[in-house]
Amino acid sequence: MSRLLVGLKLAQSHYLSQLHKYPVATKAVTSGFLYLISDSLVQGIELSRDKDKKYDFKRSMRMAVFGFAVTGPLFHYWFKYLDKHFPKKSYRHAFIKLTIDQVVCSPVFNFLFFSGMGILEGKSKDDIVEKLKKDWLTTYVSDCVVWPFINFVNFAYISSIHRVTFMNVCNIGWGAFLAKMNSSH
């Protein structure tokens, strides 16, 4: 057991070191990995319900690419922007940040998600527009139910260097929801 704890402590130390040295790259890799996990969880559930279905590795890789290329970098810079304009670690500033996030970033992020996934899937512009019409609003409304509480905790209690990591861990469930929404026809 002590070897496991030592190994975990070393992994944590290495991760924190990389987070300080290469914040955007570390957050991008973390996001990509956790998006891969999210989609794998969804597919695992789908496979348990439909024995004829096969694991879609390309689908999981598209999720990972989106997490890596968009989610990690976007939220690194977005949270920096919010911290610059609302620097106090107070409940008031946490509430302001989460409100701005829900009104500005969340709708844009959900648009980017469905558009980006459509592009990665090789869909036509018309197909992407149809997907947005079908699922964007439902996803945004769900986002408004789930993320305000998480973001309040994030902005009020989590240090700025760890905000994207915290969001990514919470995002495992949300990423699974997004994967399910994106795979629905």
UniProtKB/Swiss-Prot annotation:
InterPro entries: Mpv17_PMP22 (IPR007248). It is found in: Membrane. The keyword Transcription does not apply. Pfam families: Mpv17_PMP22. Keywords: Membrane, Transmembrane, Transmembrane helix. It is a multi-pass membrane protein. It comes from the Eukaryota. One of its GO terms (cellular component) is cytoplasm. Belongs to the peroxisomal membrane protein PXMP2/4 family. PANTHER family: PEROXISOMAL MEMBRANE PROTEIN 2 (PTHR11266:SF80), PEROXISOMAL MEMBRANE PROTEIN 2, PXMP2 MPV17 (PTHR11266). This is PXMP2/4 family protein 4. It comes from Dictyostelium discoideum. The lineage of its organism: Eukaryota, Amoebozoa, Evosea, Eumycetozoa, Dictyostelia.
